[in-house]
């Protein structure tokens, strides 16, 4: 029953978002006992490749969650669970004696109006999400990086429709030299 009510409360994409992305680069810092989060950079990107339906994640999966609220109405308009390597590192012996800071990125649909974002982390003791960061973001802010993106060569291997309703796989040519690009594409096609 809870799932059906959540589905009924889904957000209208066109009301709140454009088809661009807002990439949020943030640091997770801490050790075995504590963690904190801080935004490092905001970046406007030209495409939103995520869902335009089911913007509110009903499942609660992941060690972290991002929640996006419409500032004017305080309505939850986007949420997604995610995991990080920092979360894994916090469970190591090294984290008992050291504090580290790891950079992470998450993309949300680009808001049309000011929003409030929250990043929460699941506490292993009670399995509940607890607030790490809460910040207002104005999509018109001069502090959002809108610089030209680097031109990269992209080869589509298979295309089955708009990415908002599909799962995208990206193959990076790491380990291949510039002269081996044809081999890389052939290897990716074989996959």
Task: Please give the residue ranges for each predicted region.
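Exposed beta-strand and adjacent loop surfaces of beta-rich binding modules
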Residues: 61-65, 114-116, 166
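Bacterial Sec-dependent N-terminal signal peptides
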Residues: 1-13
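Short, aromatic- and glycine-rich surface loops/edge beta-strands on solvent-exposed regions
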Residues: 104-107, 111-125
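Short alpha-helical segments and helix-capping/turn motifs at coil-helix boundaries
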Residues: 48-53, 101-104, 113-115, 152-156, ...
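N-terminal prosegments of processed precursors
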Residues: 10-104
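Fold-level signature of zinc-dependent metallopeptidase catalytic domains
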Residues: 141-191
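Edge beta-strands of extracellular beta-sandwich domains
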Residues: 79, 124-141
